[in-house]
Curated annotation (Swiss-Prot):
Subunit description: Part of the 50S ribosomal subunit. Binds 23S rRNA.
SUPFAM superfamilies to which the protein is assigned, alphabetical: RplX-like
Sample GO molecular function, one term: large ribosomal subunit rRNA binding
The entry's keywords: Ribonucleoprotein, Ribosomal protein, RNA-binding, rRNA-binding
Pfam families recorded: Ribosomal_L18A
Alphabetized HAMAP family for the sequence: Ribosomal_eL20
Family: Belongs to the eukaryotic ribosomal protein eL20 family.
Annotated protein name in UniProt: Large ribosomal subunit protein eL20
Amino acid sequence: MSEIKIYRVEGVMLLSHDRFPVWQKFTKEVRALNKEQAIEYVYSVLGSNHKLRRKHIRITKIEEITLSEVRDRRIVALARLERFVKL
């Protein structure tokens, strides 16, 4: 079984592409098995939350980070869990 890694994905997304287009920067920290899954997750989340198509999302940088570099408390809490079910 592969180990889950933490990735920081940075890029820009095009908001209000039809009226007044604005490129907005974003940074997402995600847990994934590899870079491809992390990119797919970012496309999925930004597309569903902001009603964006993939062509309106441009990923500029993706890097694997350690637990001490994570800024999102939810990611840290998930990474520190030993198991999900009580015994």
